[in-house]
């Protein structure tokens, strides 16, 4: 954020000490266990939703929130339900070329970390799929940038989540014909990922449609 950037500059000039720098850094994070910067870690969180290995809307819910605790419980139930003792859904059978394309489209549409060029190639290789930088360049050329998240703007991942987050993004990418809506996920298909979680009256997780309009067009815009 601007204040953290200012303090870093002042520290580099020798005008403030390490204590002031640490105070500014700590104040930039909303809760323990979070990273507001849309770098490698959060880009991978986005990818996990795009390939359907996350529960819908789970990527950017903060630690310590009641919703995060409920999502953790629900994820445990889902992991058990798709294990060998239930509706067996191994990742090796679920992830295919459509999943990888969806991941790359998500990366380009959100302006994610360039480190994902390496991460996604490795991820694809583990599924027996060859993904090259040229493949990513060709996908990038036809994928609109729908998000502006720090460091591409002053807004962090929490602002992105509040503006509509992954549910809104996935729905827009499907609407634009930019992703494979039929790619398999732990929830069914990618089309089933275009949802946002909330806690129902019984304290359990429920899902609803994402908002029809972006909460902030400077951060997250529709595909058309």
Cite the ranges covered by each PLM segment.
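Catalytic or ion-coupling anion/metal-binding cores of large enzyme and transporter domains
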Residues: 1-224
